[in-house]
């Protein structure tokens, strides 16, 4: 009964196309409102939705009339595209099953009698829009352009990296070459040092073959007698004049190899008496087998050994002589011999007044000869040189060093790496107070005599002025040669006061007393400084080192030589 009034209503015509309503909505509005189709599709009782009574018949009979298909699924999909939703009836939480296949669809703007609301029903738009696609294309073009720029920069960076790699490789090769050159230079320097040390060690070994007594032993083997040059210096004259004299008070076999000069006490009267007795005493020459063979050299090569004895009671000078020399008595009235006159400039230049002097145990001339010449031989005809000759001699030494360098550049030598460490770390470091003498002890020296006194000098003048001919004389050694000889040490004596040399002995001793003192089983402790014999020519060459004013090297202590 309710459907009859709906069938009597006139059929609603679809809105014109110009109204902006989609064709699907217009067809749907006409389909629901037409009377012939009300049996299959119709409005609901409240007019807010429409119902499909029989889906199969509706798909076969109604859909082909309004649409180009008879597929119910396509119709439902189109309804969903415009926002229609399927209505589900729920009674007490249970879905009401449609026996007859009733399906209800609902839209807020699709209502019965409200055709004007159809304009508000819009089809859903897809998520992808062409504008958005255009924007993404622009972004893509930007990304592509930026990627191209990055690629160009990357190529530039790669080229720079390759250049840096090549430069780095060249630098490493250069560093390796420089390291190799540096290593070779170090090896050359080590070989040079090794060669120099070898020369010094060879020279030292040669010098060790000479017979030398122990420094702390006063008894030793016999030794050839030599002339002793005693320098006497008058009070009014500063020139040192050497005098050849033989004053042997002991036999060579019974005394030490070295000359012993005992310190003189401060008793002035005993000194005066001793000076008178000494000049009037006979001189006994010594005989030895070595004297006959070496008399010519020994007469010109003094062997001076200074012994400082702790015994303060007895003092006696022992001076060696050659058997070929006549026994003479030297007095204040006797003139000087021609030999002493010829060697007076030598001794005046060789003996210097130096408050900071030290002593060496090796012959400086022979040491320098062994360095400059491999065979250790130098001409014996070198006389006393002047300033010009001295400069020429030093130039010759420089030339020898240049030849030395040229010889080193053309030869190969082996070197021990440990030797350099021992060479530069074996220097002796001693306490400067170890060798400072006691202020109460007497210093040792060389007796000085009058020079150019002449026959007019009388003995009374000597007695009246016993201390007028005493001079402070010290011996200056050679530190460079002492270091090369392998005996470095500290200074023997240092201080503000100069060393004093006694001119005479305290008491004259007889030959028997000297023999008894030499046979003493417990000899007193003494300090020895050994000087090897020098010829006249060698002594003249030694003057060069005094003119150079080389600082001396100490020899109080025995130092080990460099190891091979």
Swiss-Prot record:
Acidic residues bias locations: 271-280
GO MF annotations in UniProt: core promoter sequence-specific DNA binding; DNA-binding transcription factor activity; protein homodimerization activity
Domain of life the protein comes from: Eukaryota
GO CC terms in record: chromatin; cytoplasm; nucleus
Stretches the record annotates as Hydrophobic repeat HR-C: 390-415
Major location (coarse): cytoplasm
Keywords: Activator, Cytoplasm, DNA-binding, Nucleus, Phosphoprotein, Stress response, Transcription, Transcription regulation
Hydrophobic repeat HR-A/B: annotated segments: 133-206
Tissue: Expressed in most tissues with the exceptions of blood and liver.
Protein family (similarity comment): Belongs to the HSF family.
Biological role stated in the UniProt entry: DNA-binding protein that specifically binds heat shock promoter elements (HSE) and activates transcription. HSF2 shows constitutive DNA binding activity, even without heat shock.
Listed name of the protein: Heat shock factor protein 2
């Amino acid at each position: 009964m309710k459907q009859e009034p709906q069938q009597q209503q006139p059929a609603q015509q679809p809105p014109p196309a110009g109204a902006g309503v989609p064709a699907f909505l217009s067809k749907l509005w006409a389909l629901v409102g037409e009377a012939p189709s009300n049996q299959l599709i119709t409005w609901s009782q409240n007019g807010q939705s429409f119902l499909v009574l029989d889906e199969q018949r509706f798909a076969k009979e109604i859909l082909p009339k309004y649409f180009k298909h008879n597929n119910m699924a396509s119709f439902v999909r189109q309804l969903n595209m415009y926002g229609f939703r399927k209505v589900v009836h729920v009674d007490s939480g249970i879905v009401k099953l449609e026996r007859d296949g009733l399906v209800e669809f609902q839209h807020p703007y699709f209502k019965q009698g409200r055709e004007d609301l159809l304009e508000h029903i819009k089809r859903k738009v897809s998520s992808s829009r062409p504008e958005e696609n255009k924007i993404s294309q622009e972004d893509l073009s930007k990304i592509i352009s930026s990627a191209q720029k990055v690629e160009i920069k990357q190529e530039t960076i790669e080229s720079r990296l390759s250049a840096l790699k090549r430069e780095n490789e060249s630098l490493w090769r250069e560093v390796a070459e420089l390291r190799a050159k540096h290593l070779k230079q170090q090896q050359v320097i080590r070989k040079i040092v090794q060669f120099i040390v070898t020369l010094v060690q060879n020279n030292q070994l040669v010098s060790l073959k000479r017979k030398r007594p122990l420094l702390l032993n006063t008894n030793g083997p016999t030794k050839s007698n030599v002339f002793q040059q005693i320098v006497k210096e008058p009070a009014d004259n500063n020139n040192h004049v050497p005098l050849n004299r033989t004053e042997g008070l002991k036999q060579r076999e019974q005394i030490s190899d070295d000359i012993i000069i005992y310190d003189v006490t401060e008793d002035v009267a005993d000194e005066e008496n001793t000076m008178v007795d000494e000049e009037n005493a006979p001189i006994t020459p010594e005989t030895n087998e070595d004297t006959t063979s070496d008399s010519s050299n020994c007469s010109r090569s003094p062997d001076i050994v200074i012994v400082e004895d702790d015994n303060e009671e007895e003092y006696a000078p022992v001076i060696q002589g050659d058997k070929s020399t006549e026994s003479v008595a030297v007095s204040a009235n006797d003139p000087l011999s021609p030999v002493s006159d010829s060697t007076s400039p030598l001794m005046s230049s060789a003996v210097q007044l130096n408050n900071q002097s030290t002593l060496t145990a090796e012959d400086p001339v022979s040491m320098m000869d062994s360095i400059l010449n491999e065979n250790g031989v130098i001409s014996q005809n070198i006389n006393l040189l002047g300033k010009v000759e001295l400069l020429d001699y030093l130039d010759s030494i420089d030339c020898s060093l240049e030849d030395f360098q040229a010889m080193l550049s053309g030869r190969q030598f082996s070197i021990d790496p440990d030797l350099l460490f021992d060479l530069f770390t074996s220097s002796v470091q001693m306490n400067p107070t170890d060798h400072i003498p006691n202020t109460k002890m007497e210093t040792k020296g060389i007796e000085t005599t009058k020079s150019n006194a002449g026959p007019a000098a009388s003995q009374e003048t000597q007695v009246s002025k016993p201390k007028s001919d005493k001079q402070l004389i010290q011996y200056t050694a050679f530190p460079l040669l002492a270091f090369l000889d392998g005996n470095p040490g500290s200074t023997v004596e240092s201080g503000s006061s100069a060393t004093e040399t006694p001119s005479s002995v305290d008491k004259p001793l007889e030959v028997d007393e000297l023999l008894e003192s030499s046979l003493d089983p417990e000899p007193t402790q003494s300090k020895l400084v050994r000087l090897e014999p020098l010829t006249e020519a060698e002594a003249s060459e030694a003057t060069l080192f005094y003119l150079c004013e080389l600082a001396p090297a100490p020899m109080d202590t025995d130092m080990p030589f460099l190891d091979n």
